Amino acid sequence: MKLQGSLACLLLALCLGGGAANPLHSGGEGTGASAAHGAGDAISHGIGEAVGQGAKEAASSGIQNALGQGHGEEGGSTLMGSRGDVFEHRLGEAARSLGNAGNEIGRQAEDIIRQGVDAVHNAGSWGTSGGHGAYGSQGGAGVQGNPGPQGTPWASGGNYGTNSLGGSVGQGGNGGPLDYETNAQGAVAQPGYGTVRGNNQNSGCTNPPPSGSHESFSNSGGSSNDGSRGSQGSHGSNGQGSSGRGGGQGNSDNNGSSSSSSGSNSGNSNSGNSGNSNSGNSGNSGSGSRDIETSNFDEGYSVSRGTGSRGGSGGSGGSGGSGGSGGSGGGNKPECNNPGNDVRMAGGSGSQGHGSNGGNIQKEAVNGLNTMNSDASTLPFNIDNFWENLKSKTRFINWDAINKGHAPSPSTRALLYFRKLWENFKRSTPFFNWKQIEGSDLSSLQKRAGGADQFSKPEARQDLSADSSKNYYNNQQVNPTYNWQYYTKTTAKAGVTPSSSSASRAQPGLLKWLKFW
């Protein structure tokens, strides 16, 4: 009974510990800690007392019963006084050790419950979400550059007009406004490359600059006229001097800077100086430029294919300068697959100026057209080739006879054609006795078969008629033999043209067959 009571106390202590741990979700950290401490003390004291008292009482009662039954009432009372105290002392020590073990178990349970309280408390509180990062400020548009001073042309022949170089391109800062600079000629420099595009999810995508030159070199020849004003570039760029579209033909301006637009770099190549002539000034070289088109892809980063301007025609004895080649569009990284990147194409190369001794470029164009028109092989249709192909595909026609004029008359050709059809019909119907149907006489057979010696005797004629009548009426043979007639043909190449009367005489059986039907 004592042992059962101890177990009941242990279960009650555990239940109280579970009930004390229940308010942890609502009471906070202090309530959970106190409940855990109380549950640990209850478990330790309950286990120690229950185990110690139960073991002590069970051992005492067991020893007393054993000694009483084994030695009788007298000996039992004597031994009970001496040995009972010894066993009771030892069992008390064992009970104390078990109580210490129960206290240790209680402390471990208290630590476990306290850890659970801390975990529940930490999970119940949620931290506030971090704020969104501030967006970078939009870079301001550049100020339009003022046109620079006009270059002074030199009057003396053979000297080259100098032209100051354009300023270097400013490097745009990351996230900052785009830097614009004006060069000495007034052309607005392009925005710096290397900046991150706006609205681009690939933060590491930067645009390398195009392969064209950032600076404009345009050294014009002597005694050059002022070129026409360049076309107005987009976003405040103003080209001074001759550009790809507005430059005067033959003469390049001293202020040879190209037009540019915001968000794209027009690559201008160095236009070479033309050669010296024996007399007079050398031709002027056209400055390379590109036609810039803006689009709505990614902040204006679309570069279309540019074409270089044609070099000017040479003066007397001077050769024309070469046109500048348009710069190619900037490269794209493979990971930056944006829709705007597909339009960035390579720039076209400028055309070479062909100068002659006082000549004109239009003469070469006219000569080229005349050469193309005079060449018959380049024509899309050639009647000779067509006629040869037609004759090769229609070999059943005697083209040689047609070309030589030896073709037979239409009536003769019709009779020959029908004769061929008639012979084919008789060969396809061997079950008819065509000799009796046609009723051909011996003279016609001799003429057609060429065997006059075979049918010269009357007996042979009678035997032939008797045999043929017998074969016609009795028809005893399975495969009757026929005397097929083969007519002598006169070829058209031999030059013999049979008349209609001769053709009708060669076909007496055909006329009789028509009368029979």
Swiss-Prot record:
<feature type="signal peptide">
    <location>
        <begin position="1"/>
        <end position="21"/>
    </location>
</feature>
<keyword id="KW-0964">Secreted</keyword>
<feature type="compositionally biased region" description="Gly residues">
    <location>
        <begin position="236"/>
        <end position="250"/>
    </location>
</feature>
<feature type="compositionally biased region" description="Gly residues">
    <location>
        <begin position="347"/>
        <end position="358"/>
    </location>
</feature>
<keyword id="KW-0325">Glycoprotein</keyword>
<keyword id="KW-0221">Differentiation</keyword>
<feature type="compositionally biased region" description="Low complexity">
    <location>
        <begin position="251"/>
        <end position="289"/>
    </location>
</feature>
<feature type="compositionally biased region" description="Gly residues">
    <location>
        <begin position="308"/>
        <end position="332"/>
    </location>
</feature>
<comment type="function">
    <text>May act as a soluble regulator of keratinocyte differentiation.</text>
</comment>
<feature type="region of interest" description="Disordered">
    <location>
        <begin position="123"/>
        <end position="364"/>
    </location>
</feature>
<keyword id="KW-0732">Signal</keyword>
<feature type="compositionally biased region" description="Polar residues">
    <location>
        <begin position="197"/>
        <end position="206"/>
    </location>
</feature>
<feature type="compositionally biased region" description="Gly residues">
    <location>
        <begin position="127"/>
        <end position="145"/>
    </location>
</feature>
<dbReference type="GO" id="GO:0005615">
    <property type="term" value="C:extracellular space"/>
</dbReference>
<dbReference type="GO" id="GO:1903575">
    <property type="term" value="P:cornified envelope assembly"/>
</dbReference>
<comment type="subunit">
    <text>Homooligomer. Seems to be able to homodimerize and homotrimerize.</text>
</comment>
<feature type="compositionally biased region" description="Gly residues">
    <location>
        <begin position="167"/>
        <end position="176"/>
    </location>
</feature>
<comment type="similarity">
    <text>Belongs to the dermokine family.</text>
</comment>
<feature type="compositionally biased region" description="Low complexity">
    <location>
        <begin position="212"/>
        <end position="235"/>
    </location>
</feature>
<dbReference type="GO" id="GO:0030154">
    <property type="term" value="P:cell differentiation"/>
</dbReference>
<protein>
    <recommendedName>
        <fullName>Dermokine</fullName>
    </recommendedName>
</protein>
<feature type="region of interest" description="Disordered">
    <location>
        <begin position="51"/>
        <end position="83"/>
    </location>
</feature>
<dbReference type="InterPro" id="IPR033541">
    <property type="entry name" value="Dermokine"/>
</dbReference>
